[in-house]
Amino acid sequence: MKFVPSQEEVIAIANTGKYRVLPVSCEILSDFITPIETIKILKNVSTHCYMLESVAENEKWGRYTFLGFDPKLEITCINGEMKVGNIKFRTQNPSENIRQILSEYKSPRFDYLPSFTGGLVGYFSYDYLSYSEPTVRRDTVDNEEFKDVDLMLFDKVIAFDNYSQKIILMVNMQLDEPETGYNKAVMELKNLARLIRTGEKKDEDFGYITGEISQLFDKDGYCSMVEKAKRHIHEGDI
């Protein structure tokens, strides 16, 4: 496997002092496995995995399928209580805290890599808007207990290139010790390729219905709610 950039190029970039991390990558053919099969392997070694499809304008199928596992950091916030890793604190502006975290992982762009080479993956709930727009805070009971924001920081990325039928493996290395970091990244890339080739797939546990299915409202009630929502949208309330 060829690893890019080279160690000499990494050291030169590190000496500029512009970046703190850098993606080292290699490629393997994808003719022996699919993204779905790969995510089953990842689920067998980590409880935190993701799969994202890229999409571009006027494309029916995106070029890349991104997969990741074993996040480096978890970030959550609910009702102003933020948790970054094992550290908890109160905040009125989680966006500011998230931007600060991202600033510590600034990395260079390479033309031969897809636009996503690692970073935060997760969701922002509807209630997240209330931090910048307090008027949207709902006064109903939150039975679902969804977090306002739930993100994970991934420094290893598996990207299926659906156009060229190859898999791009990426590991983000720290640039404070470029030689040591590069050797570690290369070792992780080799381990990642080995995992994809030989890893065991996790058996899926399918759910099943344990009780009767009941509807919350009838068709007329549903249509009435839709019409009411449409009026609110037309009037600018939503």
Residues of each region from the PLM?
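Short hydrophobic "helix-edge" motifs at membrane interfaces and signal-peptide entry regions
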Residues: 112-115, 226-227
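FAD-binding glycine-rich core of flavoenzymes that anchor FAD
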Residues: 95-113
